[in-house]
Regions:
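The conserved acidic donor/metal-binding loop of glycosyltransferases
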Residues: 318-322
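Short aromatic/hydrophobic "clamp" motif used to bind/position activated sugar donors
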Residues: 314
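Conserved nucleotide-sugar donor-binding catalytic segment
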Residues: 365-464
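Conserved donor NDP-sugar-binding/catalytic core segment of glycosyltransferases
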Residues: 326-359
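Short, well-formed alpha-helical segments that are part of the catalytic scaffolds
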Residues: 240-254
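C-terminal subregions of glycosyltransferases and related glycan-biosynthesis enzymes
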Residues: 2-7, 11-14, 20-37, 46, ...
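Glycine-rich, basic loop-to-helix element that forms the pyrophosphate-binding segment
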Residues: 292-309
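Acidic donor-binding segment of Leloir-type glycosyltransferases
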Residues: 250-291
Length: 558
């Protein structure tokens, strides 16, 4: 049986008097739709359901300041509280109720897999005014910025009145047309371009075309903006201009611009110099290139990258290795989400392939021991640039770089120690680096042909790098104990843990190459190693038991 407007109104009044406010509102709206006593019904709905919530709506709308918006009083839509998280939409212009908007529907959306995989970048969509039709898009605004091109901006803006939408609304920006959308990104080149587009296929392709145009503009000197670079991909390169060009060929495929830069510090003067010269002619403003017409040490070349970088974080990558572009979405999300990070160690295909779970270590001893002596390979290390320079690295370089063999070979590994006092440390199990083949044999041959000699740290002995010989490892271990003692600053418990870790690491490294030595050589060097360790421990007021001493020698000789 279909009730008349009068019957519905009488029913609504009875329900309201009995405290069934939700049922009453449904009946009031139905009576209004029957064109019965519309003025009286609307006035009572506003008085009974809206008046007590007006200030909350106004405050919620006022908190949204992402772009230009319609004045509150001029918004065409009002929202009548119906039940928890649900509102009747009333259109003041056409004087009709236009359905129910449910916040619960937005909150209950199951995220699409494509949205999960695109963790960081903003999205864009062309839509009409009715947010009820796009819960999947709205729900994404909890995780990322969402740019809406709305054909009816006034009505679209009105939804910002709803208090429960605040966690979504804070990331939403609305444009009245595609031209306004493009103008915003053309003028605000520090804002990150959206990478995903939603909507009808033709409209989606139209947005993608605009985004591609603006991306191309941002690769020009005129369109380049470094104000909000989140990640610098830093490449300290040495005598391998041919490899650098391959690395850039890969990197330039990425869709990022304002988020990213490529900082390159060129080192060496002998090999592949023409290839290096060609880098400056590559038409990509993301490239920040500095060439030295001299030979720097590997560490100072790395620090040169840190000096020229603009990013909040700097990813160090060898000119032998490629960045896995598809993994950058994840790492950009990580770097933008964890505000206390000082360093990230990313998983790589070879050197750090055993990182099978993500581990987060808080600033201090936890961060120190979480990554201590695990940074021998530089590719995949991500440093917070400002914290790097505040960590005291220059002081340590001046004190130990020239005269301490451990620090001289592994200053990048010691950086993790220094940064543990500056912030948190993260090991992440998403693979970011694909290691390439070693360029050593090519460099060796090229140097031989040109009459140049290899740098000391690149020379080999017994078919292994000079720094990996037992003689060198013993010297490094002795010097490492000095660095540890200095850093611990009287904290005996911390010093003991670091010394134990260092001892285990050195023994492990020596065992790896023990087949390069005759038994008599091993015996002599093993005893020298233990004696040097004992001398240092005694000097620091610590000891090594005879059982431990015999155990170490046994491992090295077995």
């Amino acid at each position: 049986m279909v009730l008349t407007g009068q019957e519905l109104l009488e029913y609504a009044c009875g329900q309201f008097e009995g405290g069934a406010y939700e049922t009453a509102l449904r009946a009031f709206v139905l009576a209004y739709a029957r064109n019965y006593e519309r003025e009286w019904i609307l006035e009572n709905i506003y008085n009974c359901y809206m008046a007590g919530n007006e200030m909350e709506f106004r405050n919620s709308y006022g908190r949204w300041d992402f772009g230009e918006k319609t004045a509150y009083e001029k918004c065409m839509l009002d929202f009548i509280p119906y039940c928890e998280g649900e509102y009747y939409i009333y259109d003041r212009e056409i004087q009709e109720f236009r359905g129910v908007f449910s916040v619960k529907t937005v909150e209950s959306v199951v995220r699409q897999e494509c949205f999960k995989q695109s963790e960081f970048s903003a999205m864009a969509a062309i839509t009409d005014w009715n947010w009820s039709k796009m819960p999947e898009i709205l729900s994404e605004a909890e995780y990322r910025k969402v740019y809406l091109v709305c054909k009816d901006k006034n009505r679209c803006d009105s939804f910002f009145k709803i208090p429960e939408l605040e966690k979504f609304a804070k990331n939403i920006m609305i444009f009245s047309c595609k031209e306004e959308f493009q103008q915003y990104f053309h003028e605000n080149t520090a804002e990150y371009l959206p990478k995903q587009c939603a909507g009808e296929e033709e409209e989606r392709q139209g947005l993608l075309e605009i985004i591609n145009q603006e991306h191309a503009y941002r690769l020009t000197p005129e369109g380049r903006n470094t104000e909000r670079v989140l990640l610098t991909i830093g490449i300290p390169t040495y005598e391998r201009g041919n490899l650098l060009l391959k690395r850039l060929e890969n990197l330039r495929q990425m869709p990022y611009d304002a988020e990213i830069e490529f900082a390159i510090s060129k080192n060496g003067t002998a090999l592949y110099q023409e290839e290096y010269k060609s880098v400056s002619s590559i038409p990509d403003a993301r490239i920040n290139y500095k060439g030295y017409d001299e030979t720097l040490t590997a560490w100072y070349n790395c620090k040169s990258v840190m000096q020229i970088a603009a990013g909040k974080f700097v990813l160090i990558v060898s000119d032998e290795d490629d960045v896995i572009i598809s993994a950058l979405e994840h790492y950009l999300k990580v770097l933008s989400s964890y505000t206390d990070l000082a360093m990230v160690r990313a998983k790589t295909c070879v050197q750090y392939s055993t990182i099978d779970r993500t581990m987060y270590y808080k600033k201090g001893k936890e961060a120190l021991l979480g990554g201590f002596l695990g940074q021998n390979y530089m590719s995949g290390a991500i440093y917070h640039r400002e914290k790097f320079w505040k960590s005291g690295v220059d002081v340590w370089d001046e004190k130990y770089y020239e005269d301490n063999s451990f620090y001289g070979f592994y200053p990048h590994a010691w950086c993790q120690v220094l940064l543990s006092d500056m912030g948190d440390y993260l090991e992440d199990n998403v693979c970011l680096i694909s290691e390439g083949d070693s360029a050593y044999e090519d460099m060796k041959e090229q140097y031989s042909q040109t009459g140049n000699s290899l740098a000391e740290n690149l020379k080999w002995d017994r078919n292994i790098p000079v720094y990996a010989t037992w003689e060198s490892r013993i010297e490094q271990h002795k010097d490492a104990l000095e660095c540890i003692h200095d850093f611990a600053g009287g904290d005996k418990e911390l010093e003991l843990k670091m010394l134990q870790r260092m001892l285990e690491k050195t023994v492990y490294l020596m065992i790896n190459v023990k087949d390069k030595y005759e038994l008599n050589e091993k015996k002599e060097l093993a005893n020298t190693f233990v004696d040097e360790t004992l001398l240092r421990l005694d000097a620091f007021g610590m000891g090594l038991s005879e059982k431990s001493k015999d155990g170490i020698i046994s491992q090295l000789l077995s």
